[in-house]
Amino acid sequence: MDNQVQSTDNEVWEKVLKARSFVPGWTFEEKSRYMFDIVLQSKPSVVVEVGVWRGLSVASFCAASLIHQCKVFAIDPWSKCAMSENGYSVHLTEGQDQLDLIYHQFIRDFKVLGLDKNLTTIRKTSFDASFDFADESIDIFHLDGAHTEWDSTRDLIAWTPKIKVGGLFIMDDANWETMKLVQELALKKYEHSTYLEGGKTRVFVRKQ
């Protein structure tokens, strides 16, 4: 039985590797594997990612959900206007027409990869989407949204009540200068768990 389970895990992991072969992004394989494994280990009911772009990181959650059935929510406005609100658009080279194409390509790619079975895509800003979730309803939360001090701290305040005590908060680009403040604030409600990607990603556990 254990060999059969391992075989299934490996077969599904191949979907992530396939996604990594053609979906652009900056997620290291170490992080992809961590996010795949953490779903299988912690057996969540609800997983949320904010900041999807082309979907490279959320592919791990979607693949793992085929083994351990859980709901995966991918949240991104794919909006030039939304990204311009607090100056983050300086990091964005695409116009709105290109962002629309990226959104539709993401939907198509995940259908072709067979990764959309448990996936719900929400095309809203992070703040607006936070109102769609009940308090303490999220087991794993991955934040890869706008990395300004304002946006990241607003995300922390908006989403922390939605994450279960004992739930995971995975923060991307923790090595950015503008992400220092949100990490200091996070430690008031979370405990540090681990770093990934040489400090690029930081994982917290909600303690209160």
Regions found by a protein language model. Give the residues of each.
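A short alpha-helical cap/connector motif
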Residues: 1-208
